[in-house]
From Swiss-Prot:
Top-level division of the source organism's lineage: Archaea
InterPro entries: Ribosomal_eL21 (IPR001147), Ribosomal_eL21_arc (IPR022856), Ribosomal_eL21_CS (IPR018259), Ribosomal_eL21_sf (IPR036948), Translation_prot_SH3-like_sf (IPR008991)
NCBIfam families, per the entry: PRK04306.1
Species the sequence originates in: Methanocella arvoryzae (strain DSM 22066 / NBRC 105507 / MRE50)
GO cellular component, one term: ribonucleoprotein complex
Record-linked Gene3D superfamilies: Ribosomal protein L21 (2.30.30.70)
Record key words, sorted: Ribonucleoprotein, Ribosomal protein
GN (gene name): rpl21e
GO molecular function: structural constituent of ribosome
Protein's UniProt name: Large ribosomal subunit protein eL21
One GO term (biological process): translation
Family: Belongs to the eukaryotic ribosomal protein eL21 family.
Length: 99
């Protein structure tokens, strides 16, 4: 019978932090606010387990659709399909304006 290997399967290198960046992330990442329509990058912080999106969405860029409690809804395009990722603010980075 097949077994599940957990949500963090095959993330040994993907979720690694640099040696000097290890430990908890700063509080400012937890309290950052976003506006609906703002572009954000999904950058998973492995030291924060709550609100962590699935590993497939690491590195993708999406648009904030809304908020529910402490989590944010991020709309992304995955292989031509529109999907909604639910993640906490520790796993999101605002996109810098290129203009």
């Amino acid at each position: 019978m097949a077994r599940s290997h957990g949500e963090r399967l095959k993330t040994r290198h993907k979720f690694n932090k640099d040696l000097r960046a290890r430990g908890l992330s700063p509080v400012s990442k937890a309290v950052q606010e976003f506006e609906v329509g703002q572009k954000v990058h999904i950058d998973i912080d492995p030291s924060v387990h709550k609100g962590m999106p699935y590993r497939r969405f690491q590195g993708l860029t999406g648009e904030i659709l809304g908020q529910a409690g402490r989590a944010w809804f991020v709309g992304i395009s995955d292989g031509g399909k529109k999907k909604t990722v639910i993640a906490r603010s520790q796993h999101l980075k605002p996109q810098k304006n290129s203009a």
